[in-house]
Amino acid sequence: MDVVMKLNNIFSGLPKKKKSKVLGRGIGCGKGKTSGRGHKGQKARSGVSINGFEGGQQSIFTRLPKRGFNSLPKNKYSIINLSLIQRLIDSGKIDNVSAITKEVLYNLGVISSVKQKIKILGDGKLNTTVCIEYDFISKSAKSQVTLLNSLSDSESK
């Protein structure tokens, strides 16, 4: 006799999900009155858990010594080289007549946030006079920018 297995004749015999016991519904249900919490005391009340409490014993985090310290966050800033600024001017993305602000650099995708601090480094050569908004600048970059600005002042006179 061939038995064909079909969905309607499969039987596991056990329910897929065991029904949970209903608590606090009279002494006849098996979990009535105190609902399995025992009589009185802290654990019988609601909001039982007290983190780190070990029954009066000194807790583990007070037994162990304090170690280390939390250092202050470093000043995070974006580094921009003069070669990058010159490349942006040469490609026409930046107008060297107007000031190069954080908003301009953010719109070009050079910095990730307008609130971010900027440090200008003197890597590369700057050929045109520029007005740059910055928070920090290296000595070499400052000397290049001031040299170009002083040259442009002497040429205009």
UniProtKB/Swiss-Prot annotation:
Question: What domain of life is recorded for the organism?
Answer: Bacteria
Keyword S-adenosyl-L-methionine: yes or no? no
Q: Which GO terms describe its biological process?
A: translation
Alphabetic keyword roster:
Ribonucleoprotein, Ribosomal protein, RNA-binding, rRNA-binding
Extract one GO cellular component term from the record: large ribosomal subunit
Supply the InterPro entries for this chain. Ribosomal_uL15, Ribosomal_uL15/eL18, Ribosomal_uL15/eL18_sf, Ribosomal_uL15_bac-type
Ranges annotated as spanning the membrane: none
Q: Which Pfam families match?
A: Ribosomal_L27A
**MF-aspect GO terms:** rRNA binding; structural constituent of ribosome
Record's function text: Binds to the 23S rRNA.
Provide the assembly information: Part of the 50S ribosomal subunit.
Entry's family note: Belongs to the universal ribosomal protein uL15 family.
Entry protein name: Large ribosomal subunit protein uL15
Q: Which organism is it from?
A: Ehrlichia ruminantium (strain Welgevonden)
